[in-house]
Amino acid sequence: MNALDLDTVLLSQDRDCLEILDQTLLPGTVRVLHLSKLEDIWEAIRTLRVRGAPAIGVCAAYALALEASRSRAEDAECFLRDLRTAKDYLATSRPTAVNLFWALERMERTARENARLPIPELKERLFAEAHRIREEDVQISRNIGRIGLGLLHHGDGILTHCNAGT
């Protein structure tokens, strides 16, 4: 298996769960978790099954979009209240993860800015924003790798600190 073929966090094709690479098992075992409940995603973030600030942010953004898609609210006020409840809960999963809070705030801002839309369209906007957050991080990671490659020479070693990138 090529490491470049692995995604740390993906939304399933039918958009009913997150597919998360369980990083606690690496490098010996590659296992993808399929998590649909907010509590299970919270636990995956809390227990470092998802590692690296950017990946945690992407995971939280998709989790919020998933949870919002299940809201039965019929008006924007109730929908935003449901979203805020899920956001506040997810924020407790890793109190030091900056990207977690940044992504959750960005998702809530997207909902507030689009609150005039019909609820089904608002839900779609949240999925689109979560996807945008993921794609931005993938592009940043690729750019870092491309630029960094030009700085390395045969025999150089690399020491990493923490995990980064989706």
Language model features: what each stretch is:
Residues 49-166:
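N-terminal active-site beta-alpha-beta segment that forms phosphate/nucleotide-binding
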